[in-house]
């Protein structure tokens, strides 16, 4: 995770060799409060969103 704003519910994932990927809290799987921490490693799929690539699942 490059950065994630838990108040606004979105951030960006740094992908080696590619552009950063947008992530919205609704794409985070799990129960309860959905938040990601800077530097956290995550697995995800890249889907095409309204404004370009974004993370899913």
From Swiss-Prot:
Induction statement: In response to low temperature.
Transmembrane parts of this sequence: none
Tagged with keyword Plastid: no
Domain of life: Bacteria
PROSITE patterns: CSD_1 (PS00352), CSD_2 (PS51857)
Chief location category: cytoplasm
Domain (CSD) ranges: 1-57
Name of the protein in question: Cold shock protein CspB
Naturally occurring in which organism (per UniProt): Sporosarcina globispora (Bacillus globisporus)
